[in-house]
Each structure stands twice: as C-alpha cells, then as structure tokens.
Amino acid sequence: KNPNDVIGEFLFLISNLYSSQDNFEKSNFYLNLSNFLNPKFLFNLSLVAENQYSNKQYKKAKKTLEKFKVEDDFYYWYRIKKEAQIISKQRNKKESLNYITAEFAKINEPNNKVIFDIANFYKNSKEYEEAIKYYTKIIDNLDDISEMKADLLYRRGGSYERIGIYDKADEDLLYALKINPDDAYILNYLAYSWL
C-alpha cells in the first residue's frame, strides 16, 4: 500500500475525531490533508458532506453528495439518506420521507442496513405502522439472542406504544429485555409505559 494512502487514512481518523466533537475547523484541516494524500479514499467525501450538513451548508453538501454514484451501493445509500435529511431541514419531513421511500423502492434487494434505515425514517416521521412493518422484516431473519434483535424489538415496541398497541409494545420490550437485561433504555421505556 502507498504510504501516502496510509497517512491519509490516519489523518481522516483525526479529522473524524474533531468532527465528532463539533470542531469543524480542525476537522476540515485534517480532512483536506487526508484528501490531498489519498484522494481515492471515499470516506473523506462522506465526512466532508457530514461537516457541511452539520454547518447547515446544504448546497455544498448536496454538491459533495453528487460524487457518490449509484454503482457504489453503500455510498449511494448514504447519499440518499443525507439528501433526505437535507430535504427535511430545508422543506419538511413529509417531502423527505417521500423522497427516500421513492429511492428505496428502486432497490431490488435491500440489505438489512437499508431496511433498518427506512424503518427509522418512517419512525422519525411518526409513520409507526410502516416502521413496524420494516422492523419486523429484519427481526424475523435474526437469531433469537442477537443484541441487534434486542435493539430492533425496542424500536418496534416503541412504535407499537406510539399507536396504542400496548400489549405488543410490552411483548417486544420484555423480549428485548430478556435478550439484553442490562439495557437502561429498555428498562426506562418499560417503566415509563407502565406508569
């Protein structure tokens, strides 16, 4: 591997650290160095777009996102999600949801990550029935004791609770707690729902 590539990837990690602390000036400094040394490293562009989005530079973020092409499934889905988030900020959640669901419908065989993301978009848009449908698709294909299943049961249970189906909400939350008995979020949600 080219030494510049390795150094560029290391600088990306530093940039990401600063970005996670909302220090975008330093993040962008290290990101520019990383980009200079390793322009092929696509993670750089995703962090550029993320920093621009966090700074409400939506026009710049959209331009950066255009570099992610449909041929690269992972980055293209990242682009779609980020564009939907921008639509939500600039217009409204309904248009954002319409955009992402239209793009989702074009995917022949979405993987669990994509299905998870679309479920979360529905949940965040208060479209709980649709969120439940997609969470269920993933839950049905997971091992009974996976921590991921516990998280999905928590999310689906919360969606059931929001639409007043309390018995199914409790069932999901108790099952999630059985898988992951120390999860404070699940314990808190159950305690709150029983009040």
Where do the language-model regions lie?
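Structural motif corresponding to the intra-repeat A-B loop/turn of tetratricopeptide repeats
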Residues: Q21, N55, Q90-R91, S125, ...
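TPR-repeat structural position
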Residues: F24, Y58, K93-K94, Y128, ...
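Single-residue signature of alpha-solenoid repeat helices
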Residues: S27, A61, S96-L97, A131, ...
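Hydrophobic/aromatic packing residues within the alpha-helices of TPR/SEL1-like helical repeat arrays
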Residues: L31, L65, I100-T101, Y128, ...
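Short coil turns that delineate tetratricopeptide repeat
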Residues: P39, D73-F74, N108-E109, D143, ...
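TPR alpha-solenoid repeat register
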Residues: N44, Y78-R79, V114, M148, ...
